[in-house]
């Protein structure tokens, strides 16, 4: 079957009236480009397809010129699949590969918090499944407005319930993430989701539709009207001043049970080698899946093309129009390419699992994507024009007008009053550990099943989530996500590098070697030159940092238009890092569990409070420069942490970041159930020592018998270290400053979120 380049049938269904391309998010130039590409006016269905595929969400038209530099990050021997696929894949040894990726579902989660978050999890899980992997874990970096704001009370409980409800039903442990509160996210919550999966190295799947005559099979749920316009309206437009999109589409509705059996069906299809190509249906639904698989097939150099009959698509609503069927973002659907010989077996296997499977088309050699509806051709397009050859913009950049002023407003002692006496330091500590961004996340994480599948070794509140891949050998992985919008507001280049450095520190503190990076870049409108300058700086910072650390960027996501009216969110790059264990039994937790262990501070502390939690919590101040980043020192610190864990020299390790040494000590004491006696250097400023947020630091607990061996290693490698105390008792005692009991710390640390959002029953 071949398509007709002139496509007279498609032309015949185009209405004579002016087409509403601007309402669909297309510019005059883009509409003219479509006409030039087709040699005619597009049909309604074609116009809808171009509008979603050329949206910011699908085409990356404003970000692509900056993302290209990630391809220059190191291509390590472990990297099997890099940028451009549904998710990156790395070889972890023992015949296994791991795939991981982070995505956003920000705008839908504001409109419908439960379903927006739930389908965000479902979508990233299918991305991992599409690569051929069994999903084994989820992380959820979340950001909301002020903790006590009425809108946060509406959004946060629904988001948490949606993530927990969907992930728990799938049997996926939620092993990590973040919860951050800041007024910048009022009306623009960030709901990012990372999923990781594992597979045999020889089971990596491709999305390419190849093999003339092969069947195109739709698997999973029926198609309805939910989510129509999601990528072009929710994901590619700014909220108006009223807190919602001017054009409100329906948010997708998730069904985790259908997703679960779809996962098992696909994994069996992969194991039995019954598919030649596979693609999930996420943003832009069938439009995206059909165009990307067809374009990928043609890109292989083999004869390609596709003909599809929309009348064969199982519908939930019989009255749907062709463009609605193509644009629907109904969840729990996959598109498979199957040989005619394998088709009966595929259909029988799906029936056995209770999964709807329908042949809707055929791979052709036409070089075009042709779609029929009620006997007429409603789409006849070159698929590359939708999937690969859309508009690319090099938008203007302008450094924010207040950039220098904000950075000059440093939180110096002359600018912001600092605690000096022991009682003042004690009060500051209690206030910080109870603050929304530093308090316990148990109210959130207790709603997630962190240990289902029995593969979880460490989970929140640990520095990284750790999963066992092999019970026989102990092979395992660690994952962490980090981001700090305040740092990035002060300096998007340095702020992004700080997020990368912290995520690497987190997986190294757990005992694993960082091996790969993913990212979710959350920004305001790309039409704002100041936002685009921030974005360009963030991309450059991440690319340079990865080159310095020797880590590949395997893929990620860009989420633009996170703003209300003309006010964007702080630039918020969220960085995910994958770490590798030879043996997860050597992992290092954060808790101080052994009385008498020596506490050693690794790294150097400076007076660095720009963008700090202390400055915000005590003074509502955001200004100055963020902490400095030294990647050579970060890499050395990571190597020391991994060696100490591997060689049995550490009983606990915790990276230092928000809240500084004081926050890390509180978290480790409460996690392990033991107190600590701390001695600060003579002549030092206790406030700086306790609350500075200098990067490149960690606190470790070392058995006395291992102290000399560990410190000798630090000396030989050139890593600064200092003995700061000992694990002891049931108080946190800072010599000559203050003492506070663990019970008082626990009450302050654990009481905040239940007081704000209600106690869990």
Swiss-Prot record:
Mg(2+) 2 binds at residues 127, 280. Gene3D superfamilies: PurM-like C-terminal domain, PurM-like, N-terminal domain. Its EC number is 6.3.5.3. InterPro entries: PRibForGlyAmidine_synth_PurL, PurL_linker, PurM-like_C_dom, PurM-like_C_sf, PurM-like_N, PurM-like_N_sf. Belongs to the FGAMS family. Keywords: ATP-binding, Cytoplasm, Ligase, Magnesium, Metal-binding, Nucleotide-binding, Purine biosynthesis. It is found in: Cytoplasm. It catalyses: N(2)-formyl-N(1)-(5-phospho-beta-D-ribosyl)glycinamide + L-glutamine + ATP + H2O = 2-formamido-N(1)-(5-O-phospho-beta-D-ribosyl)acetamidine + L-glutamate + ADP + phosphate + H(+). This is Phosphoribosylformylglycinamidine synthase subunit PurL. The gene is purL. Residues 1-16 have a biased composition (Low complexity). The lineage of its organism: Bacteria, Bacillati, Actinomycetota, Actinomycetes, Frankiales. The active site is at 57, 105 (proton acceptor). GO terms for biological process: 'de novo' IMP biosynthetic process. It comes from Frankia casuarinae (strain DSM 45818 / CECT 9043 / HFP020203 / CcI3). GO terms for molecular function: ATP binding; magnesium ion binding; phosphoribosylformylglycinamidine synthase activity. Part of the phosphoribosylformylglycinamidine synthase complex involved in the purines biosynthetic pathway. Catalyzes the ATP-dependent conversion of formylglycinamide ribonucleotide (FGAR) and glutamine to yield formylglycinamidine ribonucleotide (FGAM) and glutamate. The FGAM synthase complex is composed of three subunits. PurQ produces an ammonia molecule by converting glutamine to glutamate. PurL transfers the ammonia molecule to FGAR to form FGAM in an ATP-dependent manner. Mg(2+) 1 binds at residues 103, 557.
């Amino acid at each position: 079957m071949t398509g007709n380049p002139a496509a007279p049938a498609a032309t015949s269904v185009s209405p004579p009236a002016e087409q509403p391309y601007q309402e669909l998010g297309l510019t005059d130039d883009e509409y003219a480009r479509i006409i030039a590409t087709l040699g005619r006016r597009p049909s309604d269905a074609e116009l809808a397809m171009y509008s979603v595929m050329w949206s910011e969400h699908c085409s990356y038209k404003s970000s692509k010129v900056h993302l290209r530099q990630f391809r220059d990050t190191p291509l390590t021997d472990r990297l099997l699949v890099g940028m451009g696929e549904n998710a990156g894949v790395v070889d972890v040894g023992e015949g296994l590969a791991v795939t991981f990726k982070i995505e956003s579902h920000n705008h839908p989660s504001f409109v419908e918090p439960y379903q927006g978050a739930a389908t965000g999890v479902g979508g990233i899980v299918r991305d991992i499944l599409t690569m051929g992997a069994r999903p084994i874990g989820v992380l959820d970096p979340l950001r909301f407005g002020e903790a006590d704001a009425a809108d946060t009370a509406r959004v946060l409980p629904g988001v948490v319930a949606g993530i927990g409800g969907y992930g728990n039903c799938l049997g996926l442990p939620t092993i990590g993430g973040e919860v951050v509160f800041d007024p910048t996210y009022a009306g623009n919550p960030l709901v990012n989701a990372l999923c990781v999966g594992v597979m045999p190295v020889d089971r990596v799947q491709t999305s390419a539709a190849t093999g003339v005559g092969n069947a195109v099979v739709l698997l999973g749920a029926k198609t309805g009207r939910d989510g129509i316009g999601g990528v072009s309206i929710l994901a590619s437009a700014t909220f108006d001043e009223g807190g919602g999109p001017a054009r409100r589409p329906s948010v997708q509705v998730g069904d985790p049970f259908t997703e679960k059996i779809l996962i098992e069906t696909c994994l069996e299809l992969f194991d039995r080698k019954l598919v030649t190509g596979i693609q999930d249906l996420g943003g832009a639904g069938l439009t995206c899946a059909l165009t990307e698989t067809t374009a990928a097939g043609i890109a292989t150099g083999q004869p390609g093309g596709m003909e599809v009959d929309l009348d064969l698509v199982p519908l939930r609503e019989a009255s749907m129009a062709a463009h609605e069927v193509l644009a629907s973002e109904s969840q729990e659907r996959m598109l498979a390419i199957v040989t005619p010989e394998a088709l009966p077996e595929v259909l029988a296997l799906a029936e056995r699992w209770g999964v709807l499977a329908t042949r809707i088309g055929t791979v052709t050699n036409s070089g075009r994507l042709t779609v029929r509806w009620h006997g007429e051709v409603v789409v006849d397009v070159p698929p590359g024009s939708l999937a690969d050859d859309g508009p690319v913009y090099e938008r203007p950049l302008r450094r924010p007008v207040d950039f220098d002023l904000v950075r000059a407003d440093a939180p110096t002692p002359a600018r912001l009053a600092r605690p000096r006496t022991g009682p003042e330091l004690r009060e500051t500590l209690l206030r910080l550990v109870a603050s929304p961004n530093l308090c316990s996340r148990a109210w959130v994480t207790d709603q997630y099943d962190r240990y289902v599948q029995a593969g979880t070794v460490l989970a929140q509140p640990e520095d990284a989530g750790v999963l066992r891949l092999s019970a026989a050998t102990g092979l395992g992985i660690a994952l962490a996500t980090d981001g700090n919008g305040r740092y990035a507001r002060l300096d998007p280049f340095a702020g992004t590098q700080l997020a990368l450095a912290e995520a690497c520190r987190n997986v190294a503190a757990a005992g694993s070697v960082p091996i790969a990076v993913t990212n979710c870049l959350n920004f305001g409108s790309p039409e704002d030159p100041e936002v685009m300058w921030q974005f360009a700086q963030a991309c450059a910072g991440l690319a340079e940092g990865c080159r310095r650390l020797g880590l590949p960027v395997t893929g990620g996501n860009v989420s633009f238009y996170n703003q209300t009216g003309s006010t964007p969110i702080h630039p918020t790059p969220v960085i995910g890092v994958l770490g590798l264990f030879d043996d997860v039994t050597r992992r290092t937790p954060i808790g101080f569990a052994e009385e008498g262990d020596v506490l050693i501070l690794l790294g150097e502390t400076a007076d660095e409070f720009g963008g700090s939690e202390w400055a915000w919590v005590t003074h509502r101040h955001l200004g100055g420069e963020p902490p400095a980043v030294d990647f050579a020192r970060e890499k050395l610190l990571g190597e020391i942490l991994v060696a100490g864990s591997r060689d049995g020299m550490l009983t606990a390790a915790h990276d230092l970041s928000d809240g500084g040494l004081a926050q890390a000590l509180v978290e480790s004491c409460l996690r392990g159930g033991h107190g600590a006696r701390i001695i600060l250097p003579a002549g030092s400023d206790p406030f700086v020592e306790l609350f500075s947020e200098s990067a490149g630091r960690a606190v470790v607990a070392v058995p006395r018998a291992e102290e000399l061996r560990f410190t000798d290693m630090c000396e030989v490698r050139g890593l600064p270290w200092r003995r700061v105390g000992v694990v002891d008792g049931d108080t946190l005692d800072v010599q000559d400053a203050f003492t506070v009991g663990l019970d008082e710390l626990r009450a302050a640390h654990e009481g905040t979120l239940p007081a704000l959002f209600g106690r869990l029953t």
